[in-house]
């Protein structure tokens, strides 16, 4: 879950999400999230925006290594060699999110 030092910080992030949403709609793109340590907080913020189903496809919460492997196809070797919190694992998660969604 995101923590904000003030309500203004939260409002600022929601405005940024609105800008992202407008760009996605204009370009006719959809987005998906693949999260681990954030536990779905990014997807939760996206879905706070009315009409987000027009541009937000889905969110994967892959906290465990098994979830990373099962849901988005992160390779066991990647997790073994680089660890769950690594650039390589994040890249595999992002690619898997594209492959397993309509984004």
Spans of model-derived segments:
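Short alpha-helical segments enriched in small residues
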Residues: 1-103
């Amino acid at each position: 879950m995101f923590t904000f030092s003030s309500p203004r910080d939260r409002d600022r992030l929601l405005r940024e999400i609105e800008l992202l949403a407008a760009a996605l709609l204009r370009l006719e793109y959809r987005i998906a999230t693949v999260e681990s340590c954030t536990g779905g907080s990014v997807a939760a913020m996206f879905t706070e925006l009315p009409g987000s189903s027009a541009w937000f496809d889905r969110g994967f919460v892959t906290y465990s290594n098994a979830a990373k492997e099962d849901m988005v196809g992160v390779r066991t070797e990647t997790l073994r060699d680089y660890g769950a919190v690594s650039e390589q694992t994040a890249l595999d998660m992002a690619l898997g999110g594209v492959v397993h969604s309509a984004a």
